[in-house]
């Protein structure tokens, strides 16, 4: 029997023993060594050759991943590991570290119970380290730490034992500060900081395949002094043989990460708001493989032979071929064609996948990343909140008109596979817009359409996504219907930043119980009476109904909300989305005859009232900004900081780290287009840098008129603004 077949059989045997299952993700900042580490674990489990581990990058299965040397998609694999005489099944997801692909990390965290955070010993905790930790902790996923590239401290930087200890302790301290800061208000999480003594921190070199932790040193009798001697003498093979990385890391996974039986009672209440007393809630908490089927889809991929594959976590019940299951948000049922598990880029079909495991399913044609799939209709899981929103848009056109239907189908598939991509399809003009997390994100999507689907495309210049927001309180404004029989009286004011953040993070939404929503918003600073009058939340905008006993308003409210959403999706300045508004409906006059207060009357009246209130509230254009970090040799520091300042940016900090200077600052996304080639030439290719989306800020007053005019022209809108907009 082939080795692979044997592993699949071992996995199938262990699937029914949730106490010996570990569902884990490996996450880190870009280039800190996640995928190389994953290769080591696969080699340790006998799934790839030990000789090529670290070079094979077995989880980077896409051609563009191997070309760019970065992980773009999250890849899944199941393997086995013996720990304390007991075989364990480890379902592992290797995630991307580049900020543009953070959506994959967010979705992976929903499927797992533990996150192995990898940090480069030389660079330390970086911006994306903080982001992946936040994503893990928000989902109730327990972290452990592996400090990689320790060989560089010994061989390259020639650090002595004291220097090295100081540096490693500083990395641990930084990670623990982040964990403490993020969990202090989470009542259900005890102390999840990591520690060398407890064995939740490992050190080593994924490239040279050795690793150590406190338990492994006690077991092998090796200490750091001996490791430094072997590393300096270039005896890395002996190091690998005496303290193999895969054993150290997988032992840590088995010992310190919770199994599904321990994890699900804590995680289910965080991600599911259904009836906590129901049988279904019990089945999920107890990982009952005989209960109703509940699958949370975290990823959609396409196999050229099998079609669409939905990957996700089975929280309850057992998945089997032929089952007919409900998919949240769609009517009818989907029939399962096959179930399987992942072995790197390959899917292995199995007969069944019980609760507590990560499964690969075909046949769920209506599922998207984030769907809840179940054998009985149920309250779906909380939607997966992505930490970043799209900030760059590109137009995409097929070079040949004959390819248009195929391109539209491909773009719809892209949006299904990656919910952080927004696709706008215009069948009339043939020009379609895709919005994503950054230039690289959209570049990769464009290349995959051409390479995988064989559709030659033209893409436009990157366009930055703007927002509009009120800056002060408006007066009460009247909106009239075209027939003059209906009137709405509305005022608008800016929402507090904490309230906007609470909505963004999914901690307050219309899907949750009213009392919970009220409490969350009051905690964020909302007035108690206001929190009780909420009628609707759209994006990060809240509608309050402050009317008293108005006839026919109840049956008209749906149209009011429709008019409100239309007005907020296309702001009055440049038809960009409005954010952070508190809209008060004070009063309404409605015609008693329903025929005179239909959609054609109510929607324009509300839209007019909302737009005029926003104008009265000094609405301004907001632009997206990015945090920028540049690591550069001392003599190029001036050039690096000049690159930020020359882009309307601001340098917030400069400090020495090892032999490099670090420049940190903030710059507008619009000015960061083309940054990579400019920073390379300014620093003679000596700089490494990282950008991370940091929300939106008000565009400077002197730039507002030109930018509004430019956007309106691009959208084919007339240049004249509403005459009330006179504050420029």
Swiss-Prot record:
Superkingdom of this protein's organism: Archaea
Chain segments annotated as transmembrane: none
In-chain residues carrying the UniProt-annotated modification Diphthamide: 596
Domain spans labelled tr-type G: 19-261
Keywords for the protein's UniProt record, in alphabetical order: Cytoplasm, Elongation factor, GTP-binding, Nucleotide-binding, Protein biosynthesis
Entry GO terms, CC: cytosol; ribonucleoprotein complex
Localization, UniProt: Cytoplasm
SMART domains in the cross-refs: EFG_C, EFG_IV
Principal location: cytoplasm
Family, as annotated: Belongs to the TRAFAC class translation factor GTPase superfamily. Classic translation factor GTPase family. EF-G/EF-2 subfamily.
Name of this protein: Elongation factor 2
Species of origin: Haloarcula marismortui (strain ATCC 43049 / DSM 3752 / JCM 8966 / VKM B-1809)
Record gene name: fusA
């Amino acid at each position: 029997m082939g080795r692979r077949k044997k592993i699949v059989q071992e996995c199938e045997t262990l699937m029914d023993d949730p106490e010996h299952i570990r569902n884990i993700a490996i996450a880190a900042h870009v280039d800190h060594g996640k995928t190389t580490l994953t290769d080591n674990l696969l080699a340790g489990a006998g799934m790839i050759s030990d000789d090529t581990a670290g070079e094979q990058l077995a989880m980077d299965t896409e051609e563009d991943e191997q070309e760019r040397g970065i992980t773009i998609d999250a890849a899944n694999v199941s393997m086995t590991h013996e720990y304390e005489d007991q075989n364990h099944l480890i379902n592992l997801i290797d995630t991307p570290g580049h900020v543009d692909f953070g959506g994959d990390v967010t979705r992976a965290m929903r499927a797992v119970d533990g996150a192995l955070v990898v940090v480069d010993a030389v660079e330390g905790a970086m911006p994306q380290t903080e982001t992946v930790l936040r994503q893990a902790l928000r989902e109730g996923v327990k972290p452990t730490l592996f400090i990689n590239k320790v060989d560089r401290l010994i061989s390259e930087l020639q650090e002595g034992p004291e220097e090295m200890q100081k540096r490693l302790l500083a990395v641990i301290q930084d990670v623990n500060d982040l964990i403490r800061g993020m969990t202090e208000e989470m009542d259900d999480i005890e102390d999840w900081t990591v520690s060398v003594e407890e064995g939740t921190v490992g050190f080593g070199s994924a490239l040279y395949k050795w690793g150590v932790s406190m338990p492994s040193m006690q077991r092998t009798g090796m200490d750091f002094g001996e490791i430094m001697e072997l590393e300096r003498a270039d005896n890395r093979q002996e190091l690998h043989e005496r303290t193999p990385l895969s054993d150290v890391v997988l032992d840590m996974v088995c010992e310190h990460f919770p199994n599904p039986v321990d994890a699900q009672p804590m995680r289910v209440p965080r991600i599911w708001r259904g009836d906590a007393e129901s049988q279904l809630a019990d089945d999920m908490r107890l990982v009952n493989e005989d209960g109703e089927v509940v699958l949370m889809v975290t990823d959609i991929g396409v196999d050229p032979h099998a079609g669409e594959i939905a990957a996700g976590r089975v929280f309850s019940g057992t998945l089997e071929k032929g089952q007919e299951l409900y998919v949240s948000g769609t009517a009818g049922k989907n029939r399962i064609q096959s179930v399987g598990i992942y072995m790197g880029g390959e899917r292995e079909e199995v007969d069944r996948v019980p609760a507590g495991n990560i499964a690969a399913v075909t046949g769920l044609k209506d599922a998207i990343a984030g769907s809840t799939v179940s054998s009985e209709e149920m309250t779906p899981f909380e939607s997966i909140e992505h930490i970043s929103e799209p900030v760059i848009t590109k137009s995409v056109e097929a070079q040949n008109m004959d390819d248009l239907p195929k391109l539209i189908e491909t773009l719809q598939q892209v949006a299904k596979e990656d919910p952080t991509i927004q696709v706008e399809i215009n069948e009339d003009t043939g020009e379609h817009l895709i919005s994503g997390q950054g230039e690289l994100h959209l570049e990769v999507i464009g290349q995959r359409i051409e390479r995988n689907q064989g559709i030659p495309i033209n893409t436009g210049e990157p366009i930055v996504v703007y927002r509009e927001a009120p800056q002060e309180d408006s007066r009460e404004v009247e909106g009239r219907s075209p027939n003059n029989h209906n009137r709405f009286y509305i005022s608008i004011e800016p929402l507090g930043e904490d309230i906007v953040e609470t909505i963004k993070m999914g901690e307050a939404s219309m899907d949750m119980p009213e009392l919970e929503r009220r409490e969350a918003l009051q905690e964020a600073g909302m007035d108690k009476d206001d929190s009780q009058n909420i009628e609707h939340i759209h994006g990060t905008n809240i509608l309050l109904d402050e009317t008293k006993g108005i006839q026919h308003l109840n049956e008209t409210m749906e149209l009011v909300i429709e008019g409100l959403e239309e007005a907020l999706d296309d702001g009055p300045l440049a038809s960009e989305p409005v954010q952070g508004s508190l809209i008060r409906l004070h009063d309404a006059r409605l015609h008693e005859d329903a025929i005179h207060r239909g959609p054609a009357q109510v929607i324009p009246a509300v839209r007019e009232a909302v737009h005029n209130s926003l104008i009265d509230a000094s609405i301004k254009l907001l632009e997206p900004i990015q945090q920028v970090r540049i690591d550069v040799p001392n003599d190029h520091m001036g050039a690096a900081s000049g690159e930020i300042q020359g882009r309307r940016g601001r340098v917030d900090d400069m400090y020495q780290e090892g032999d490099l200077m670090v420049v940190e600052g903030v710059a507008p996304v619009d000015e960061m287009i083309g940054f990579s080639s400019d920073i390379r030439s300014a620093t003679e290719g000596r700089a490494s840098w990282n950008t991370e989306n940091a929300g939106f800020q008000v565009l400077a007053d002197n730039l507002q008129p030109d930018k509004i005019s430019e956007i309106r022209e691009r959208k084919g809108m007339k240049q004249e603004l509403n005459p009330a907009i006179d504050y420029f």
